């Protein structure tokens, strides 16, 4: 929940697609919806608030248009999908399902409180779906089998992968993506290399053959 909804999903590395194995999909979805429903919209300065507004009105309007477009092309709204009728640019927490590859929404980034939910039969199908994206900043895999998590992480085409944690940024962790999510890294030991001019110095013996 936090992976999708921190800052109301208005971050580049917030979770966008939730890809779940069929064997646990119903149980996951029920718990996911129940947890999302507990969010309390309000003034971000109020400690009781757990759901803030969109950054600006135009962002809300654009997001609502994206959801309507997804539905027009066959997606189903499992919860939310509308504006919250209260002062401010608030949107209902939303889950979209049945978003097929030919749906324009499949290729879009929903920059707000909208999660796309996918069911898959097995690990290979999950990885193929995860990699079928124009973006590749970060991702997460949750599993009791850490070795399996490492295997999946190595096959997902992103700049960052987190096992049993949400995608996160920290000054000590190199940050960056692949594909349309950019190139290069900032932060961490890799990030400092962006500010270093590297020099080659080769030493030969004075009497070595030319």
Segment roles from a protein language model:
Residues 1-100, 163, 208-210:
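ALDH superfamily catalytic-core signature
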């Amino acid at each position: 929940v936090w992976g999708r909804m921190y800052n109301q999903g208005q971050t580049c590395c917030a979770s966008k697609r939730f890809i779940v194995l069929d064997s646990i999909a119903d149980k996951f979805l029920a718990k996911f919806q129940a947890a999302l429903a507990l969010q309390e919209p309000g003034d971000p300065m109020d400690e009781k608030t757990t759901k803030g507004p969109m950054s600006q009105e135009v962002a809300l309007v654009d997001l609502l248009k994206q959801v309507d477009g997804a539905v027009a092309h066959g997606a189903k709204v499992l919860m939310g999908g509308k504006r919250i009728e209260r002062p401010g640019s608030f949107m209902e927490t939303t889950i979209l399902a049945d978003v097929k590859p030919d749906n324009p929404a499949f290729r879009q980034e929903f920059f707000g409180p909208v999660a796309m939910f996918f069911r898959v039969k097995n690990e290979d199908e999950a990885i193929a779906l995860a990699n079928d994206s124009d973006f590749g900043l970060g991702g997460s895999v949750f599993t009791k089998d850490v070795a399996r998590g490492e295997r999946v992480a190595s096959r997902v085409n992103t700049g960052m992968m987190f096992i049993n944690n949400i995608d996160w940024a920290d000054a000590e962790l190199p940050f960056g993506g692949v594909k349309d999510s950019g190139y290069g890294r900032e932060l961490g030991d890799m990030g400092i290399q962006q500010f270093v001019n590297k020099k080659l110095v080769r030493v030969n013996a004075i009497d070595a053959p030319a």
